[in-house]
Amino acid sequence: ECWSTKTATFMIGGNVCTRPCGFCSVPKGKTEELELDEPERVAEAAARLGLRYVVITSVTRDDLPDGGAEHWYQTVLAVRQRTGAQIEVLTPDFRGNRAAVTRVIESRPDVFNHNTETVPRLYHRVRRNADYQRTLDLLQQVKQEAPEMPTKSGLMLGLGETLEELYEVLADLRRVGCDMLTLGQYLQPSPEHLPVERFLPPEEFDEIGELAKKL
């Protein structure tokens, strides 16, 4: 489906993450130095593939003073220079480093995405080194510094959240000016990861979507 619309996602910053999130299959551990030619290589790939929509995401790099923000900036600029594609960034939280977030904003992506992932009660289990309020603060900062830039967030469902908790998250996202929301069913990557508590039927996704649209 994505490829038919010339959409692709690139993960930058290496393939090892500094955070052990319970839902994610990306390897955790000791990271390597950033590859300084990576921005240009991503741009070349996007150009050769003729992409119309490029999503850039990354591992979390808590080992870097700016969390990799300058690398993000250079990657967005390189893709912009080589292609006419729209660019969406899906960033980590940069440990609440506002200057790092500002640097990514300065690259002027078409969409700024930062996932909420789950409800506050489950953060300690799902996103152990993340913080719910930090996520909201990041999305709000983007709106404050670039009001015209669409913001986006995503939630995984089926981890044990309640409808009431989801509604509170939807209200919080609306309060900080989040423009777009994606909802997805959590799927367990391996037996070592968090189990699926429930598979939601399509009509429940529709119900939650309608709740979000009414806010």
Put a short name on every predicted segment.
Residues E1-E33, Y53:
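N-terminal [4Fe-4S]-dependent radical SAM core
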Residues E1-K6, E40, E44, R48-G50, ...:
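Auxiliary Fe-S-binding modules of radical SAM enzymes
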Residues P27, V59-R61, L90-R95, E117-V119, ...:
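Active-site beta-loop-alpha junctions enriched in small/polar residues
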Residues K28-V55:
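Conserved alpha-helical substructure of the radical SAM core
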Residues V54-Q74, G160-E165:
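Conserved glycine-rich "GG(E/T)P / GGGxP" loop and the immediately following alpha-helix
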Residues D63-T75, N97, L122, V126-L136:
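Active-site-adjacent beta->alpha loops and helix N-cap segments on the catalytic face
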